[in-house]
């Protein structure tokens, strides 16, 4: 049976690659888009276009019906209030609409997400809200893979060997933290859906010189899994303590975490690769 993926942010620079990767892998690939004409021009043939606003609950509920996975490649652009409404709000809306606990969630955020005292974050709160979106995903009970890519497109042409890191230790906030090709980000987000070892993991993604690996199973297998029901990745520094979070954020985190699916056997019980 053909499985269905919904991509949120499909017309962005990563989303376009994600759609191509998903179609090539044989998934029925849906994209939630605001502008049908623009999306039809940009997205590959075979993509099913669902027109609507990703912050609108009825629209999202219709879009996620019968999906097997959701892939988030969306992102804000630094405007006032955008980080909360887009980076966090869209994830919250989609998770709230999902009824099937087995739906896999692939979420793209950013390397350096645990650095909250930078000038950029103080101005936009982007990293605060991206990290809060990660927390929602972890507490939701859904099988998930959270990918924190390095600097998009700063890689050299021969820099295709993927490197998975954990603990968010590259925190300079410059390209020296690591670079990655856009299509490789999409590859990890899409391929993770069918790799049981990828479930319940958080990783930073960069590349180094050398050819890309033929498959990602061994890379995912080497990662530490997040603790069940946790809010932060297993090796993350506690730089955004829950004790200092706004009440509304804590209430939403508590609400989404009331029913947390166990994932001690994530490798076989939930990943698509188990079927």
Describe every region a protein language model picked out.
Residues 9, 33, 109, 206-207:
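Short beta-strand/turn micro-motifs composed of small residues
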Residues 2-3, 103:
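Nucleotide donor/acceptor-binding cores
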Residues 4, 11, 176-177, 182-275:
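Mid/C-terminal beta-alpha module of Rossmann-like enzyme folds, strongest
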Residues 56, 90, 133, 181-184:
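Conserved cofactor-binding/catalytic machinery of classical short-chain dehydrogenase/reductase
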Residues 6, 10, 31-93, 97:
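NAD(P)H-binding glycine-rich loop region in Rossmannoid oxidoreductase-like domains
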Residues 14, 70, 137, 147, ...:
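Non-catalytic, hydrophobic alpha-helical segments
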Residues 3-27:
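N-terminal Rossmann NAD(P)H-binding glycine-rich loop of SDR-like oxidoreductase domains
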Residues 76-168:
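Glycine-/Pro-rich loop/turn segments that contact NAD(P) or position catalytic residues
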């Amino acid at each position: 049976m053909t499985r269905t993926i919904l991509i949120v942010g499909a017309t962005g620079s990563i989303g376009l690659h994600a759609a191509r990767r998903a179609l090539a892998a044989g998934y029925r690939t849906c994209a939630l888009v605001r502008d049908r004409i623009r999306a039809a021009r940009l997205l590959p043939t075979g993509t099913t276009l669902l027109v609507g606003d990703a912050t609108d609950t009825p629209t999202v509920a219709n879009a996620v019906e019968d999906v097997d996975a959701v892939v988030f490649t969306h992102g804000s652009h630094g405007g006032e209030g955008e980080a909360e409404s887009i980076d966090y709000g869209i994830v919250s809306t989609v998770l709230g609409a999902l009824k099937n606990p087995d739906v896999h969630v692939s979420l793209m955020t950013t390397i350096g997400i645990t650095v909250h005292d930078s000038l950029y974050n103080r101005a936009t709160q982007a990293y605060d809200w991206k990290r809060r979106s990660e927390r929602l995903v972890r507490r939701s009970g859904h099988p998930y893979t959270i990918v924190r890519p390095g600097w998009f497109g700063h890689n050299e042409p021969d820099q295709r060997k993927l490197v998975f890191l954990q603990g968010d230790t590259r925190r300079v906030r410059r390209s020296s933290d690591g670079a990655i090709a856009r299509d490789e980000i999409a590859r990890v987000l899409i391929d993770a859906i069918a790799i049981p070892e990828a479930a319940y993991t958080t990783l930073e993604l960069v590349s180094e010189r050398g050819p890309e690996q033929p498959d990602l199973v061994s890379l995912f297998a080497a990662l530490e899994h997040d603790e069940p029901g946790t809010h932060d990745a297993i090796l993350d520094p506690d730089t955004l303590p829950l004790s200092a979070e706004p009440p509304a954020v804590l209430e939403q985190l508590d609400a989404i975490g009331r029913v947390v699916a166990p994932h001690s056997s994530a490798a076989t019980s939930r990943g698509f690769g188990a079927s």
